[in-house]
Amino acid sequence: MSADNVHATKGERMYDTGSTTFMLICTMLVFLMTPGLAFFYGGLSRRKNVINTMLMCFGVIGLVGVLWIVAGWSLAYGGDGSSPFIGGFDQLLCLPVLNQVLQAAEGNAAGGAVYPEIINIAFQMAFAMITAAIVTGSLAGRVKFGAMTAFLGIWLLVVYAPLAHMVWGGEGSFIGDIIGALDFAGGDVVHISSGLTGLILCLMLGRRRGFGMVSYRPHNVPFVALGAGLLWFGWFGFNGGSEFKADAVAALAILNTVTASAAGMVSWLAVERVHTGRPTLVGASTGLVAGLVVVTPGAGFVEPWAALVMGLIVSPVCYFAISHLKTKFGYDDALDAFGCHGIGGILGGVLTGLFCVPELSWTGKGGLFYTGDVSLLVSQILGIVVTVAIVLVLDLVIAAVVKALFHGSLRVDEADEALGLDASQHGESAYPSFSGLD
């Protein structure tokens, strides 16, 4: 290629190569999170269900990857912006992508964009993948693989995509603009939606065989730590990339991500030490994730000291939800998707209403701590309530449809559950030479 072909001609505007590279790296980091979650959940599961648990996460990669290209992206971010609830159908199969690529090849930055819009398709696909994968943690050990796949496929298009539009659809979007709720990287869209969906489905499925009588200990603690480490690393792209350019706010989001996750880990270990008398690696890993969850809604809106406070607060709250609420109410959130992501996401959204720096706010409204004005806090709470209501109603409808399609039950039969889903559903074993306890 000659030098003349490398550079844009006079009058043409190139994309910002720094931000383009940054967003490409962030996108790849977020894609790493779903395999990381597979290890995290796989380690927490019982030995006889580890392959099923991990496959539910890996299966989401294929399922969401296809559906996002076909319709998910268009429903979330397509259209002309006239609808506050959903995108449109103008970008089905991502057909406009070719024009963007050709424009970029000619050295033209489409519409004055900082980087090619095509990156957003992949970046948001990775968000959709990790969100759907989080749901599977509540269902471990008893759900039909086909039923789970069918549910999540419909859920992606009917719940996740419209919710993403309502929060991140820009001017006119219902939650992000009309209500004025802030969600930097996915407190409402990712964590509350997935955690609440997990809770709803685990209530519909019922408790695992032996729940309350059998101790469901993590079968592979190093897997849990490995998964947490991959999630932690990927989360820098998750939060940092949500600024959508390489600037000081992206750097702030990354710093806050480290700060909150570290504080969450320390706080969890302290609570665990007081409650049980000993710190654990599973506890450290869970606290790390809880800290990541709580800072997600406000990663680019709060100061580092506030991220520290958020991390310190979230672990006792999530620990209580996991250790006490499940026992009190008797629901079987198997791998604590609701206890960590649902509760942590709600708390993060509320705390953003307290600690948001006015100058960093998308709406111009600052947190109560800075302004003494409760308007942003009210918007945050209202945004959470609306998210919960939408997810609750649509989840129940989708679950009823899928249940009817699968002969009235989303759950495997008792014999298959007792044998283990690895053998009964997949004919595989993670440890074929091991003959000990499950």
Regions from the PLM with identified roles:
Residues 9-438:
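Glycine- and aromatic-enriched membrane alpha-helices
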